Amino acid sequence: MSSDATNDELHRRLFDEGIKVRKDVLGSEYVENALRNATPFTRPGQELITEWAWGTVWQRPGLDRKQRSLLTLGLIIGQKAWLELGLHTRGAINNGVTELEIREAVLHAAVYCGTPSCIEAMIVTQKTINDMVDKGEYKRPEN
Protein backbone atom coordinates (compact mmCIF):
# COMPACT_ATOMS: atom_id res chain seq x y z
CA MET A 1 0.00 0.00 0.00
CA SER A 2 1.42 3.37 -0.94
CA SER A 3 2.11 6.06 1.62
CA ASP A 4 -0.64 8.25 0.11
CA ALA A 5 -3.17 5.42 0.29
CA THR A 6 -2.20 4.71 3.92
CA ASN A 7 -2.49 8.39 4.77
CA ASP A 8 -5.90 8.63 3.06
CA GLU A 9 -7.08 5.53 4.93
CA LEU A 10 -5.95 7.01 8.26
CA HIS A 11 -7.76 10.30 7.55
CA ARG A 12 -10.93 8.42 6.55
CA ARG A 13 -10.82 6.30 9.71
CA LEU A 14 -10.27 9.33 11.98
CA PHE A 15 -13.04 11.22 10.18
CA ASP A 16 -15.49 8.31 10.49
CA GLU A 17 -14.70 7.83 14.19
CA GLY A 18 -14.88 11.59 14.72
CA ILE A 19 -18.31 11.80 13.09
CA LYS A 20 -19.64 9.17 15.51
CA VAL A 21 -18.34 11.02 18.59
CA ARG A 22 -19.34 14.43 17.27
CA LYS A 23 -22.92 13.24 16.62
CA ASP A 24 -23.10 11.58 20.06
CA VAL A 25 -22.05 14.80 21.77
CA LEU A 26 -23.51 17.59 19.63
CA GLY A 27 -26.43 15.78 18.02
CA SER A 28 -26.81 14.26 14.57
CA GLU A 29 -28.89 17.14 13.22
CA TYR A 30 -26.25 19.76 14.04
CA VAL A 31 -23.38 17.72 12.60
CA GLU A 32 -25.25 16.77 9.42
CA ASN A 33 -26.22 20.43 8.87
CA ALA A 34 -22.63 21.57 9.44
CA LEU A 35 -21.34 19.10 6.86
CA ARG A 36 -24.18 19.70 4.39
CA ASN A 37 -23.68 23.48 4.56
CA ALA A 38 -19.91 23.29 4.18
CA THR A 39 -18.53 25.01 1.12
CA PRO A 40 -15.40 24.09 -0.81
CA PHE A 41 -13.68 26.75 1.33
CA THR A 42 -15.02 25.58 4.74
CA ARG A 43 -15.09 21.80 4.11
CA PRO A 44 -11.38 21.30 4.99
CA GLY A 45 -12.06 23.02 8.35
CA GLN A 46 -14.95 20.64 9.04
CA GLU A 47 -12.71 17.70 8.17
CA LEU A 48 -9.88 18.97 10.40
CA ILE A 49 -12.19 19.55 13.37
CA THR A 50 -13.83 16.16 12.92
CA GLU A 51 -10.56 14.23 12.57
CA TRP A 52 -8.44 16.08 15.11
CA ALA A 53 -10.84 17.12 17.85
CA TRP A 54 -13.48 14.42 17.62
CA GLY A 55 -11.57 11.55 15.98
CA THR A 56 -8.48 11.92 18.16
CA VAL A 57 -8.61 14.17 21.23
CA TRP A 58 -12.16 13.37 22.42
CA GLN A 59 -11.28 9.65 22.30
CA ARG A 60 -8.04 9.76 24.25
CA PRO A 61 -7.81 7.98 27.62
CA GLY A 62 -7.61 9.88 30.89
CA LEU A 63 -10.76 12.00 30.70
CA ASP A 64 -14.29 10.81 30.12
CA ARG A 65 -16.73 12.75 27.94
CA LYS A 66 -18.33 14.48 30.91
CA GLN A 67 -14.96 15.77 32.09
CA ARG A 68 -14.04 16.84 28.57
CA SER A 69 -17.32 18.72 28.27
CA LEU A 70 -16.76 20.64 31.51
CA LEU A 71 -13.22 21.49 30.46
CA THR A 72 -14.45 22.59 27.03
CA LEU A 73 -17.06 24.90 28.58
CA GLY A 74 -14.39 26.68 30.61
CA LEU A 75 -12.08 27.05 27.63
CA ILE A 76 -14.85 28.40 25.42
CA ILE A 77 -15.87 30.92 28.09
CA GLY A 78 -12.26 32.08 28.21
CA GLN A 79 -12.34 32.61 24.44
CA LYS A 80 -15.71 34.39 24.61
CA ALA A 81 -16.98 32.08 21.86
CA TRP A 82 -20.68 32.37 22.70
CA LEU A 83 -22.12 30.42 19.77
CA GLU A 84 -19.77 27.55 20.57
CA LEU A 85 -20.73 27.82 24.25
CA GLY A 86 -24.38 27.20 23.41
CA LEU A 87 -23.44 24.25 21.22
CA HIS A 88 -21.16 22.73 23.85
CA THR A 89 -23.69 23.35 26.63
CA ARG A 90 -26.00 21.06 24.67
CA GLY A 91 -23.12 18.60 24.32
CA ALA A 92 -22.39 18.77 28.04
CA ILE A 93 -26.00 17.92 28.87
CA ASN A 94 -25.81 15.04 26.36
CA ASN A 95 -22.66 13.83 28.15
CA GLY A 96 -24.36 13.77 31.55
CA VAL A 97 -23.24 17.13 32.93
CA THR A 98 -25.93 18.55 35.21
CA GLU A 99 -27.30 22.08 35.22
CA LEU A 100 -25.67 22.56 38.62
CA GLU A 101 -22.29 21.47 37.25
CA ILE A 102 -22.67 23.79 34.25
CA ARG A 103 -23.56 26.71 36.50
CA GLU A 104 -20.59 25.99 38.76
CA ALA A 105 -18.26 25.71 35.77
CA VAL A 106 -19.46 29.15 34.62
CA LEU A 107 -18.97 30.63 38.09
CA HIS A 108 -15.53 29.03 38.34
CA ALA A 109 -14.61 30.52 34.96
CA ALA A 110 -15.65 33.97 36.22
CA VAL A 111 -12.73 33.97 38.63
CA TYR A 112 -10.24 33.32 35.84
CA CYS A 113 -11.97 34.89 32.82
CA GLY A 114 -13.74 37.87 34.40
CA THR A 115 -17.28 38.70 35.37
CA PRO A 116 -18.38 40.01 31.95
CA SER A 117 -17.63 36.56 30.55
CA CYS A 118 -19.51 34.97 33.43
CA ILE A 119 -22.61 37.09 32.84
CA GLU A 120 -22.70 36.30 29.13
CA ALA A 121 -21.98 32.63 29.79
CA MET A 122 -24.90 32.44 32.25
CA ILE A 123 -27.21 33.92 29.62
CA VAL A 124 -26.05 31.53 26.89
CA THR A 125 -26.05 28.36 29.00
CA GLN A 126 -29.44 29.10 30.59
CA LYS A 127 -31.00 29.84 27.19
CA THR A 128 -29.58 26.64 25.71
CA ILE A 129 -30.82 24.49 28.60
CA ASN A 130 -34.26 26.14 28.49
CA ASP A 131 -34.45 25.55 24.72
CA MET A 132 -33.60 21.88 25.27
CA VAL A 133 -36.35 21.62 27.91
CA ASP A 134 -38.87 23.34 25.62
CA LYS A 135 -38.04 20.97 22.74
CA GLY A 136 -38.24 17.89 24.99
CA GLU A 137 -34.54 17.16 24.54
CA TYR A 138 -33.82 17.45 28.25
CA LYS A 139 -35.93 16.89 31.35
CA ARG A 140 -34.97 18.68 34.51
CA PRO A 141 -34.59 16.31 37.47
CA GLU A 142 -37.29 16.45 40.12
CA ASN A 143 -36.08 18.13 43.31
Swiss-Prot record:
<dbReference type="InterPro" id="IPR029032">
    <property type="entry name" value="AhpD-like"/>
</dbReference>
<comment type="pathway">
    <text>Mycotoxin biosynthesis.</text>
</comment>
<dbReference type="GO" id="GO:0051920">
    <property type="term" value="F:peroxiredoxin activity"/>
</dbReference>
<dbReference type="InterPro" id="IPR003779">
    <property type="entry name" value="CMD-like"/>
</dbReference>
<dbReference type="Pfam" id="PF02627">
    <property type="entry name" value="CMD"/>
</dbReference>
<dbReference type="GO" id="GO:0016831">
    <property type="term" value="F:carboxy-lyase activity"/>
</dbReference>
<keyword id="KW-0210">Decarboxylase</keyword>
<comment type="function">
    <text>Nitrosuccinic acid decarboxylase; part of the gene cluster that mediates the biosynthesis of the deadly neurotoxic nitroalkane 3-nitropropanoic acid (3-NPA) that acts as an antimetabolite of succinate and irreversibly inhibits succinate dehydrogenase and disrupts mitochondrial oxidative phosphorylation. NpaB facilitates decarboxylation of nitrosuccinic acid produced by the nitrosuccinic acid synthase npaA to yield the final product of the cluster, the lethal mycotoxin 3-NPA.</text>
</comment>
<dbReference type="InterPro" id="IPR052512">
    <property type="entry name" value="4CMD/NDH-1_regulator"/>
</dbReference>
<keyword id="KW-0456">Lyase</keyword>
<comment type="similarity">
    <text>Belongs to the carboxymuconolactone decarboxylase family.</text>
</comment>
<protein>
    <recommendedName>
        <fullName>Nitrosuccinic acid decarboxylase npaB</fullName>
        <ecNumber>4.1.1.-</ecNumber>
    </recommendedName>
</protein>
